[in-house]
From Swiss-Prot:
It comes from the Bacteria. One of its GO terms (biological process) is negative regulation of DNA-templated transcription. Residues 28-51 bind DNA. Gene3D superfamilies: Winged helix-like DNA-binding domain superfamily/Winged helix DNA-binding domain (1.10.10.10). InterPro entries: TR_Rrf2-type_CS, Tscrpt_reg_Rrf2, Tscrpt_rep_HTH_NsrR, WH-like_DNA-bd_sf, WH_DNA-bd_sf. Keywords: 2Fe-2S, DNA-binding, Iron, Iron-sulfur, Metal-binding, Repressor, Transcription, Transcription regulation. [2Fe-2S] cluster binds at C91, C96, C102. Residues 2-129 form the HTH rrf2-type domain. Pfam families: Rrf2 (PF02082). Its cofactor is [2Fe-2S] cluster. One of its GO terms (cellular component) is cytosol. This is HTH-type transcriptional repressor NsrR.
Length: 141
C-alpha cells in the first residue's frame, strides 16, 4: 500500500515537530524548507492535523506550530486513519459490474486493517526518540 503524499508529508511534519526540543515552536515555512514541499500543501496538512488535535497552531508574532499532545500519545496508525483515504478500490456498481459477487473488497479491507493494526504498535515517540541520525538530517541537534 502506498500512502498519498498528503499522509507522507503529514507524518514527516509530525516527525519534525517531535524531533524538536519539547515545547519549541516551529513554523510551516520551516517544515516546508526541511522537506521541500509547497507551502500551500503543507498548510492544508497542518490544518487537518490541527483539527485532529495532533498539532497546536498559535497565531501572532510569537506564534507557530508544535505537537498538540506528547509524541508518546500519537499512534502512527491513528494519524494514517486521519489523513489517508483508505478506500483501495472503487466498488460502486457503476464502475464494476462484478460488485454484487466480488470478494476483493473484503480481502483488501482486511489487508488495510492489518496494515493499520501494525502501525498502531508505533507511536511518534518510537520513531524519533534517541534517533541521532534523524536529528542530524533534520538539523535539530
Amino acid at each position: 500500500m502506498q500512502l498519498t503524499s498528503f499522509t507522507d508529508y503529514g507524518l514527516r511534519a509530525l516527525i519534525y515537530m517531535a524531533s524538536l526540543p519539547e515545547g519549541l515552536m516551529t513554523s510551516i515555512s520551516e517544515v516546508t524548507d526541511v522537506y521541500g514541499v509547497s507551502r500551500n500543501h503543507m498548510v492544508k496538512i497542518i490544518n487537518q492535523l490541527s483539527r485532529a488535535g495532533y498539532v497546536t497552531a498559535v497565531r501572532g508574532k510569537n506564534g507557530g506550530i508544535r505537537l498538540g499532545k506528547p509524541a508518546s500519545a500519537i499512534r502512527i496508525g491513528d494519524v494514517v486513519r486521519e489523513l489517508e483515504p483508505l478506500s483501495l478500490v472503487n466498488c460502486s456498481s457503476e464502475f464494476c459490474h462484478i460488485t454484487p459477487a466480488c470478494r476483493l473488497k473484503q480481502a483488501l479491507s482486511k489487508a488495510v486493517q492489518s496494515f493499520l493494526t501494525e502501525l498502531d504498535n508505533y507511536t511518534l515517540a518510537d520513531l524519533v526518540e534517541e534517533n541521532q541520525p534523524l536529528y542530524k538530517l533534520l538539523l535539530v541537534e
